Amino acid sequence: MSEVKLTPEQNEAIHSSGKNILVSASAGSGKTFVMAQRIVEKVKQGIEIDRLFISTFTKKAASELRMRLERDLKKARQESSDDEEAHRLTLALQNLSNADIGTMDSFTQKLTKANFNRVNIDPNFRILADQTESDLIRQEVFEQLVESYLSADESLNISKDKFEKLIKNFSKDRNILGFQKVVYTIYRFASATENPISWLENQFLKGFETYKSLTDLSEDFTVNVKENLLTFFELLENSLTNGVIAKKGAGRDKANLILDNKNELLEAISKKDFVTCTALFLSIDTDIRVGSSKDEALSALKKDFSAQKQDLVGSKSKPGELRKFVDKIKHGQLIEKYQNQAFEIASDLQKFIIDFYKTYLERKKNENAFEYSDIAHFAIEILEENPDIRENLREHYDEIMIDEYQDTSHTQERMLELLSNGHNLFMVGDIKQSIYGFRLADPGLFLEKYKSYDQAENPNQLIRLKENFRSRGEVLNFTNDIFKHLMDEKLGEMTYGKEEALVQGNISDYPVEAEKDFYPELLLYKENTSEEEIEDSEVKISDGEIKGAAQEIKKLIEYGVEPKDIAILVRSKSNNNKIEDILLSYDIPVVLDEGRVDFLKSMEVLIMLDVLRAIDNPLYDLSLVAMLRSPLFGFNEDELTRISVQGSRDLRFWDKILLSLKKEGKNPELINLSLEQKLKAFNQKFTEWRKLVNKIPIHRLLWKIYTETYYFDYVGALKNGEMRQANLQALSVRAESYESSGYKGLFKFVRLINKFMEQNNDLASVNIKLPQNAVRVMTFHKSKGLEFDYVFLMNLQSRFNDRDLKEDVILSREHGLGMKYIADLKAEPDVITDFPYALVKMETFPYMVNKDLKQRAALSEEMRVLYVAFTRAKKKLYLVGKIKDTDKKAGLELYDAATLEGKILSDKFRNSSRGFQHWILALQNATKLPMKLNVYTKDELETEKLEFTSQPDFKKLVEESEKFDNIMSFSDEIKEAQKIMNYQYPHQAATELSSIQTPSQVKKRSYEKQLQVGEVQPVSEFVRVKNLDFSDFGPKKITAAEMGSATHSFMQYADFSQADLFSFQATLDEMGFDEKIKNQIDITKILTLFDTEFGQFLSENVDKTVKEAPFSMLRTDEFAKEQYIVRGICDGFVKLADKIILFDYKTDRFTNVSAISEIKERYKDQMNLYSEALQKAYHVNQIDKYLILLGGPRKVFVEKIDD
């Protein structure tokens, strides 16, 4: 292997020491490589690896760094000729598993557990990692605290009347959800500070103390209006001289009058004399009309004048920037009158928040369960209050190394300060990739060091890694051209200059000269009026955008590009369902990294929630009927109507079922034998489930329902079956988490879920296996750190999310609370109304200041998000957006006015929430970017669409959980049905046959038919048959079904090409299993598979392996003589040139190898079914079938099944 040639900057980053070092590592510059090599060099110099503190942003990054270090340390040891150095490297390898390599959260947990007595907590605390549990506890604390304050408890520091005013300021119509949202927002923000109580007590009201009037606002409040005024005056002066404004007439007089007041207006702004400023502006007439001209050049100037005047001044109905400023002044003058009342509300809010924070923390101490932020605060307290511990750690660690430093929070920064000796920090990151502001990371921490370390007098060191070893020059040049004109100190928080620009470092891989075929491509879908309107404020994506991208992807695949080398990046996962469906219709394999959206609204979960609601309360008609109509019981509308007419319309449906069973209803003759048997079977199961509610945990009950009704198998056989099954598993996990938190009872669980749905909340997505060769769809944020040959950025026209700028509170670290205040203007002399009150919600001065700060920070972060997205592409970048064909200003004409101010795009276009497409098109017009632009329509899509066989749509196989508001009504047609009720259908067997069956159902049906014809079924002496008594299950016991499902999921995730302990453990950690399940998955045992010849074969043929392979096949039932579809999923197969190697995992437990023959016999029919499906699908005659037995003693057994 050839020696890697280091750049001078990389070499410096690896070997420099004795000072704090900040490595600004641009995208693709090899920062992980540099960090690993620096650690290896430290070990060579004699520093033990456990004396290095190495903090990573995620657990995955820590695991990957460990694996990389293991490889690099081994390589260094092999190449070392120094025995002492080799010994040091060997020692480092031995201690690698114990080295402090991990997230800051993992370190603070370890520190807190080791010093629990210093903060008076139990060392056996657990982490509230499950959002459901922390939400439950927080909600209970909040509700109890609100109840206390409303009870007029005199011991509290807010009176009942004042507390009611506080709630009303943030909530509507006696609903406290608005107030609750405010409290949770402040709590989350405070928790990200290094000392929440201190911040709440000392900084929370700082804005109200600082900004009491308009004149207290900083220069930022007036800087834009000064610039706009100067621009307006210059426009008028130029227009008076170039003939745009006529030499005589009213227009010229108005312009001269405005210019006569020029100096007075500017002076009033400078002095913050807002009364004079407003009066002057309102006194002058800005309605200057210039008409048109036959002269083409003059006409263009007149048109430009009108456009600029509209932007700068506007009209009363459509104000421009100057009129908006005057409105802000008038608003400010009004809020000054209510400043004291607003401050009183803010003070009471501060008291309540502090009380809530302390009460919630005390509750968590009682539960001995904490959030990550709590543990971080405990760790800070330990180090601050205990110099002995702090100094011991400072002496222990030779160096403090931090990866992804740009995403550091103030809490983490405080930890680093306490651990460092002042000159041993090694920080690696890229300010241009700081995109986690929503997690309260502060890029300002990196930026302050970036600027100060660059000063000659600063003893610390800044090292820039600029070379990009990932991407072609076309991608890098385009990225540089965008950001050098987009970012500056004012907006972007830094200048994107020569030192920040990306430099191509992989000259040997890619040519230096640009090739037009690899220019980034902007694909704009021109949507016509017959299609859905573009939603300016939403991130909705149109079919046309996705189809345009799909056709380009299809071409790439035809040219030989592997699907796994293509990624689609989206703003949010809300469009995932639509993207997946359309790509599949083009026969493009696709995987959604973050799953399909709306877990709680997925068909299978909705059905199970209705089942739980019905079990909890069978008198709830909607859920009961929905359950009956679902695939679990399969009652059709005719049958439900027959039941419905057994009683009056106001009688509960459950009572009608009981009447039907007893044949005591109004129309008992309608309950035929078939329906009666169906009702009895339902009632038996349903009654049993209801009896078990108080005997077994909810998650056990769910699994009993899944298995008894074959519903788990059923949804697994549908389209997206794996995701559906994962959703059902997730519902069970949520139920278990709920109960493990100390909460009991189905009623409360159903209430919790209902509350989530009422608030349009969702539960966390579920982890499923990722196909190895498929186009990946993920959010921009999720893509950080990854790379793909071809990258498609979708939905670029969507607006930036500016909802945070409209919330009732906006917070900042410096100024604390900014809030809106609801004032009753009835007392104002200018307000005339017949209503008893005139409530107006207005922005306080601290709110205005925080809003301005947040808006600039948000736009700066959006720029960085775009930078991250661009730099994922290795070879080519595709940008996909949409324009209208009706409104000219929404099309490309709007960008004719885009210009540069110096080297930067004008603020008119930069300082906008209209989205990435708005920036790119503006820059395209202003600078002519090195990219290709293609506009296409729906008609062009249809004519150019590649003809491929679409996958069948199986969605109709299962209907949504329906709500039958009218099912209870009587139908006259039912009486006609009586005439045919006794008709005997000649193909009764076919009516009992499901049109779609899973392999398990086929196997069960075959077994039942064999019993009917009189065959005796032998029971193996090695297989003990018993009836499971669910009432005996303890809350912590794991069922075989759950373990089997978890083990199968792990085998689907595991990368067989990296079959080692580190890799498999990392995979297991990522899958999010419950700890009890995770601890029972024996990775060491699973790895014995790869000691076998078959395991080695799998490792060597990963590229030919298809895991989790779905199939469907038409078969004929020998008894019903009818055809039916078998759909299922086999665990995997390897497709070779002349044959297919089929394999399936089995987790059946056995202790004696003599039981293997019985297991093989048990699954022979199932494997033959899979084999038959593969033969028909691939037209291959030879299918070798193997069972991988994971449940045996000590190791994995591989057994071939003979025909």
Swiss-Prot record:
CDD domains: DEXQc_UvrD (cd17932)
Limits of the UvrD-like helicase ATP-binding domain: 4-472
Transmembrane segments: none
E.C. code: 3.1.-.-, 5.6.2.4
Catalytic activity: Couples ATP hydrolysis with the unwinding of duplex DNA by translocating in the 3'-5' direction; ATP + H2O = ADP + phosphate + H(+)
Physiological role: The heterodimer acts both as an ATP-dependent DNA helicase and an ATP-dependent, dual-direction single-stranded exonuclease. Recognizes the L.lactis chi site (5'-GCGCGTG-3'), which stimulates homologous recombination. The RexA (AddA) nuclease domain is required for chi fragment generation; this subunit has 3'->5' exonuclease activity and probably also performs the helicase function.
Record's miscellaneous remark: This enzyme is a functional homolog of the E.coli RecBCD enzyme; unlike the RecBCD enzyme it degrades both duplex strands symmetrically.
Protein name according to UniProt: Exonuclease/helicase subunit RexA
Gene that this sequence comes from: rexA
